[in-house]
Every structure is written in C-alpha cells, then in structure tokens.
Amino acid sequence: MFTLAEVASLNDIQPTYRILKPWWDVFMDYLAVVMLMVAIFAGTMQLTKDQVVCLPVLPSPANSKAHTPPGNADITTEVPRMETATHQDQNGQTTTNDVAFGTSAVTPDIPLQATHPHAESTLPNQEAKKEKRDPTGRKTNLDFQQYVFINQMCYHLALPWYSKYFPYLALIHTIILMVSSNFWFKYPKTCSKVEHFVSILGKCFESPWTTKALSETACEDSEENKQRITGAQTLPKHVSTSSDEGSPSASTPMINKTGFKFSAEKPVIEVPSMTILDKKDGEQAKALFEKVRKFRAHVEDSDLIYKLYVVQTLIKTAKFIFILCYTANFVNAISFEHVCKPKVEHLTGYEVFECTHNMAYMLKKLLISYISIICVYGFICLYTLFWLFRIPLKEYSFEKVREESSFSDIPDVKNDFAFLLHMVDQYDQLYSKRFGVFLSEVSENKLREISLNHEWTFEKLRQHVSRNAQDKQELHLFMLSGVPDAVFDLTDLDVLKLELIPEAKIPAKISQMTNLQELHLCHCPAKVEQTAFSFLRDHLRCLHVKFTDVAEIPAWVYLLKNLRELYLIGNLNSENNKMIGLESLRELRHLKILHVKSNLTKVPSNITDVAPHLTKLVIHNDGTKLLVLNSLKKMMNVAELELQNCELERIPHAIFSLSNLQELDLKSNNIRTIEEIISFQHLKRLTCLKLWHNKIVAIPPSITHVKNLESLYFSNNKLESLPTAVFSLQKLRCLDVSYNNISTIPIEIGLLQNLQHLHITGNKVDILPKQLFKCVKLRTLNLGQNCIASLPEKISQLTQLTQLELKGNCLDRLPAQLGQCRMLKKSGLVVEDQLFDTLPLEVKEALNQDVNVPFANGI
C-alpha cells in the first residue's frame, strides 16, 4: 500500500519554480491534495471496513414447515436456545455465544457435544435449571459458509459498481489532474527553458546592479524634481551637503543632466557622482546581460511553453467536465439497503436476499465532498482559460517599467518569453521590473561605462599617449565598450583616435580639451551631447571617419562649420543599396581637403557644395570604375586632384576645366595612352603630374607644351624610352621613371639644370651619360636594379647629392671621387657592403662622419 506522501509527490515541483505558479495553480494544487486525501481515505476504509451483510427473504409463517428439512425438527428447535445460551469463563465474566446464522442443522447421527464444544458445559446448567425457552427469530436453515457465499455474491451483483470503485477512480482522476498541472515543469523541451529562465531571473533579482540601477532611477527623478523646485525660486536654499553625499546618482546622459548641490556660502552646480560597483559584481552583471540576451533570442523563437500550458489547462477542464457528468448520476445510486437475486436457489434454497452496505453513508458523503471539490477545481480551470484567451499572453510590454524608470529602451518581448513574464507577474511584478533592467541597452551601457572608468584611469590613459609623426600628442583607443571619462581630462591631447567603439559617446567634458584639433572615428558612430557638439563645431580642424555603411557616419559630421579636412573611408555604393550617397556638405563652409576612399561609380554631386572653398580632392576607388566625372567641372578652386584606382583608361576631359589645378595624381588606373596631355597646356598652374602605376607605353612629344611642370612621375609603367621632349621642361625638378623598360638615358638630360631628384630604379640602363652630371643640383639619384657596370668619376660634380642608390647593378668598385660629394653620407648611400669596402679609407671615414658633428662642435 502506498502512502499519501508518495502519491502527493506527483504534485511537487522544485521550490524555485514557485515564481511561475499563479494563485490558481497553487489553489488547484491544494485542492488536488485534498482530493487525493479523500480518495486514499475512501480506499482505506473500503479495504478495511467494507462489508455487505445479506439475509434471505423468508416465505410467510404458514409455509415455514414446508421449508424445514425432514427429520430434524426437534434438533433445530433446540439449536437456537443453545446458541443464545450464556456461560461464564474462567474469569467469571458472562459471555454469549452469538452465532445466530453461523450454525448448521444438527443431524441425529452426530452427538450434540461434538457439534458444539460448549454444549458440554452449558447442558448440565440447563438441565439443572430445567428451563425451556421458545425459539426466537425465524429459521433460515442456512450454514455459515452459505451466508459468506451469499454476501460475496451480492457484493458483486447487487451493489452498484460505483460504490465499489469510487475510491480508485477518484485516485486515478486526481493523479491525472496532478500530472496535468505540472507537466510543463517536467517535459524536457519546456523544462530546460523554464529552468534557465528561473535561474537567470533569480540572479537578476539578486544582482547588485539591479538595485543600483533602480536607485539611480529614483535619484534621477528626485534630482529633476529638485531642479524644478529650485528653478521656481528666486533665492537658492542653503541645504546641508552631508545628505547628498551618500545618495547615488546617474551618469550624464546624451542631453547632460546636472544635479545641484548647495553649500552654506553659495549654490554650486555639480555633475552627480557615480558609485563604482565592485569589480566582481560588475563582471557578474555583464555576464547576466549576455545570458539574458542569448536566452531571449532562444526563447522568443517559439511558443511551445504557452501552447503546452494551454493544452494542459484544457485537459484539466475536460477532465473536470467528464468527472462531474458521470459522478453526479451515481450519488443517488449509493444506498444502505439492496435487494439481491443471485439465482442460487439450488444452493441455498432461497431466491431473494435483503442486503445492507455498511459503507454506503460514508461513501455518499465522500462522493459529495469530492464532487464539491472538483466543482471548485473546475471553476478555477474555467477562470484560467478565460485568463489565457482574454489577454495576449504572447506579447509582453514593459511600458509601465519604461514610464517609471529612465530605461526607456526596454524592448517588448513575445512568444514564450512574454508568457513566462506574465506568469511571473502573477507571483510578484517586482521580478519583471528588475529583469527588465537587464533587457535595456542603456542599462548595459551604464554598467559598461562604470566598469570602463574603473579600469581606464587617468594614469593608465596617460601611459598610452604617444607622439605621432607630426610630433603631436596622440591617444589611440581600440575595441573598448565606450570612451572612458578620464580621456577628457587629457587637456593637452592633440589627436584622439577611437576605433571599433560602437557605443562611443562624447560628453560635454570634451570642451576641456582645448588643444584637440584632430579626431579619428574608425567604425565608431559616436554620439555627442549638445555642448560637446558646439565645442567640436568651433575647434575641430581634421576629422577621419572610417565606416562600413554610410549610415555609420554621424549626422553631426556634416555640421562642423570650422572643419578644414575630412577623410571618409568606407562603402558608399553597396550592392544592396545603389542610391547610397553623402548628405549635404553645405554646412562645411571652411572645408579645404576632402578625401574619399570608397567604391563610387560617379563623383558625388554633393561635393559641389564645397566647391567654392575646396582646394584638394582625393578619390580612392578601390578598383571600381569611375564612370561619371561631370561634377569635377564645378571644382574650379581645386589645386590638388587625386583619382586613384578608378579604372580610368584615359585622362578625363573634365580635368581640363580645372584652371587652378596645380597637382594631378592618376595613380593605379588603366591608362594606356596619354595623347590628351596636350590639353594640359591650358592649365597654367599645373606643376606636378603623376601618371604612375599605369600601362603607358610612350610619352607623347606634346608634353613639351606643359612648360610649367616641375614634377613628373611615370614609374611602374611600360616605357621603353624617354623622348627628348621631356628634357625641354626647363622647370622640371623631379623626374621618376622607375620600374619601366628604359635601356638608355638620352644625353639631353643635361638640359635639366633645375633637376634635383632623378629616379631610374628598376630599368635596363647600362651606361650613364656624362651629360647627367651636368645636373649639378641633383640631390637624389636612384640608379638601383639596373645594368650599370661603372660609375663615372664625374660623380664628384654632384656636390649637393644627399642620396645615391646603386644597389643591384654590375659594379665592381666605387670611384674615390665620391668623397667630393660632401653632402653624401653613408646613410644616404644605398650600395652593397663589399662595394662600400672598395672605397679608400679616408672616403669611408668622410661618409661615416655625422652631418651634425660640425654643428655640435660649434655649440
């Protein structure tokens, strides 16, 4: 036999799951326990006390002799007297042998003493008293075993089946209801989600960050109220400062909120301070944010928990209706008296028996109690169904939490996640409020901000400040959760680089950085406060923005009216959005340099907004063919133009309209012919032409018309010779024809009296003409990776030479006349070590002498 505790364990759940048990589930659990007790009590009573006692229905007295077995009349008349006789036991107590229906008829062949053991002691007493009693009751002439047989037969035939099986049915129904109530806690696919949810919910509820976030919200509200009250008064109140020191306060939001703190002397405005969480608590809180984010993504995908709860509620309701329908019909069927016709007349001599059921009254009361309990249970099930279908439980809104707190970004959730939160609200709404804190990105960012400021102190940031190539103080922050507050205390910083900081916020404190003129935002769509924007608008001179999509460019970038240089690096023409473009640049009134590295198919028309004052335009197109360049015609004030990696095949005609153009760079295109170069004669200010890294095979003679050229770059092309027209450019100072197929240097090179830099590296030159050394102003002469066999002694005429490259040639020695190149030092001489060793000792010593030595001696 099982105990109540063993069966009731079906209704047990983990204590932590109680937060998901609304009042109706708890009430139904208790009702189920009561029904279980009723069923077990009824079953126990039935097993131990249940009896049916039957008596035959005797014929009328006139016919009684007809039913008396012949030859036994005398004996049977004496048996009743003997059966009701009394005797005293050894202790002197009087007992009565009550076996009215348990004796059998005595036959003449069997002694009376053998049939009744007590007759030996009772008969002498009876004979002594000589009392003769008349028989009482009516004779049935049935044996004890016959009565037992009849009782058993009538128990199964005359007794209604429900009277016999009610306890077992009640037990089975109750167990089914218990299992149905808690099946969603046991089913693996839902149990795992519920377990994770309860675990995360408990940690969120106990997290110090939840308490701190809620207290900061309350503090913010009180600060705002204080500001409104203070603003309405003409005179400041003198408030003790001790009460404000212990209260937590929120960090500065996007629109700066400052709290007021008054001293006894005068009111002082202060930014509320922030208490730093313990490092361990901060790490745990950050882990909770990650867990909540992953759990939400996992649970919101399905509504299995909701459907299972609805199904089990429907099952319980159907079970209630079924139980109520068939049990109500059997209440009146349970009675104390029953008429039994077992058809055993051939065994007992009687056809009809009158029976009594001793448990009838108890079973009837228990059944009525069970029906009453199941009715209450059913009404609760109906209420549960009403609640399930009246409210959209697959949607949960944190609107009330958003109104009561500063976390207005707490998202609404759906499906199983929403249903679980609705269930928690039936237990305690405070759980959902605290849980919502971990769904807020604002809350997570605040936590990151606290941890970040705790980790990146002023001293640590000072250690990361370095000097860049322009000798400016530079700080580079990479892959942080935000911008530490201590950064804005580095007032002497010139350059600030923020890379891969998606939640970067620039507060008003940046106005302290009076030396800041250059800002780099690499995949960092920074947000700025109004005060910070005003400072950047007036002081920022150079801005670098690197992005993946044009949407990552902060909107405030286009409003920096004092910006001088803007560098945009990213995708401005993605495959999914062909119409992507820059916003209006009209507000950039002082922009001088615009650098765009992207994949444009046409020059953005918005660039014309800055045409009146733009002096340098750079477009690096990363191999995407630039088809439309008509907008360039409007860039009348551009002095420097770079169109690199634009897959240009010819020099664009739009360039010839740029009358103020001084430098043109068409690097890394697909230009093969430059016959249009004659049109450059109209660009009177053009001094530098860079056509390097193309596929040019020849320089047309018409280049001689571009008389103002001072720098000419044709490196990394396919030139095989240099036309004499090049050497008619008397103003030429730099000529770069490196990495071509040039085999000879024309003697006309001596005409370039102003030539200072000559680069012929990576060609096939084997002889250096003597006329080359007439270019006495040469400072750089790169002759590496050629076929030169000897270096003429006239190298001594190049007294201003500071760099000479000879590495990769066929030289076997160096002339001693190198010593007469007084400006040339070993650091500027690029040659093999064995060739350097061929120089005389005094020449090597002269080359090894530091240029700064004479100046050092003179100090």
From Swiss-Prot:
The lineage of its organism: Eukaryota, Metazoa, Chordata, Craniata, Vertebrata. The gene is Lrrc8d. The chain crosses the membrane at residues 23-48, 165-183, 310-331, 362-387. The modification Phosphoserine is found at S242, S243, S247. This is Volume-regulated anion channel subunit LRRC8D. InterPro entries: Leu-rich_rpt, Leu-rich_rpt_typical-subtyp, LRR_dom_sf, LRR_domain-containing, LRRC8_Pannexin-like. It comes from Mus musculus. GO terms for biological process: aspartate transmembrane transport; cellular response to osmotic stress; intracellular glucose homeostasis; monoatomic anion transmembrane transport; protein hexamerization; taurine transmembrane transport. Residues 1-22, 184-309, 388-859 are cytoplasmic. It holds the Pfam family LRR_8.
